Amino acid sequence: MGKEDDRGEEYLFKIVLIGDSAVGKSNLLSRFSRDEFDTNSKATIGVEFQTQLVEIEGKEVKAQIWDTAGQERFRAVTSAYYRGAFGALIVYDITRGDTFESVKRWLQELNTHCDTAVAQMLVGNKCDLEDIRAVSVEEGKALAEEEGLFFMETSALDATNVDKAFEIVIREIFNNVSRKLLNSDAYKAELSVNRVSLVNNQDGSESSWRNPSCCSR
């Protein structure tokens, strides 16, 4: 206490993980937030979230990442789950084609319930299971380009691209918010009410993060 905060901004961004059951959403979250992988992970019941600190351009950003059950019987939480989200990772399992086919339905639900523009990343998880792959990298990339999403394949098991996927979404949110705050007091007020506390209006944008077809493995 008593220490003067010279950073000027304080950010808290809500990010949601969506996708069918058993695609690895919970393990992606635990790998990113705690660097852990649970081989006996059970289906999520209801909603869970973790908060992770990330530093961007000298500013402390708190990402509040929400994980929810993918089963249809839990869809009653939909509106509250999406409300106030700044970003979303839409996750499918590269070994299960049906989870990839569900992506457009998840995108429709996301766009229906979110109350603001959302930074979106399509994530093909379990890329360590190359021998039983059912969805090609090219298919994932093509869908991401069609829908205007970032794209990345990940493995929660061996941590491939997990940090990178989350960090791209967080940085994209940061850049979007910074640009809008530069010229909009109304937007600043909206964010303060919804889910972000901001003190100053400084632009921290980096256009190099805005590749809508980012794909790495």
Curated annotation (Swiss-Prot):
Residues engaged in binding GTP: 19-26, 67-71, 125-128, 155-156
UniProt-listed SUPFAM superfamilies: P-loop containing nucleoside triphosphate hydrolases
Top-rank taxon: Eukaryota
Compartments it resides in: Cell membrane
One annotated GO molecular function: GTPase activity
Record Pfam families: Ras (PF00071)
Alphabetical GO biological process terms: protein transport
Motif (Effector region): 41-49
UniProt keywords, alphabetically: Cell membrane, GTP-binding, Lipoprotein, Membrane, Nucleotide-binding, Prenylation, Protein transport, Transport
GO annotations of cellular component type: cytosol; plasma membrane
Keyword match GTP-binding: yes
Lipidation (S-geranylgeranyl cysteine): 214-215
Topology of this chain in the membrane: Lipid-anchor
InterPro entries in the record: P-loop_NTPase (IPR027417), Rab_GTPases_membrane_traffic (IPR050209), Small_GTP-bd (IPR005225), Small_GTPase (IPR001806)
PANTHER family to which the protein is assigned, alphabetical: DRAB11-RELATED
Family, similarity comment: Belongs to the small GTPase superfamily. Rab family.
Function comment: Intracellular vesicle trafficking and protein transport.
Entry protein name: Ras-related protein RABA5b
Species of origin: Arabidopsis thaliana
The gene coding this protein: RABA5B
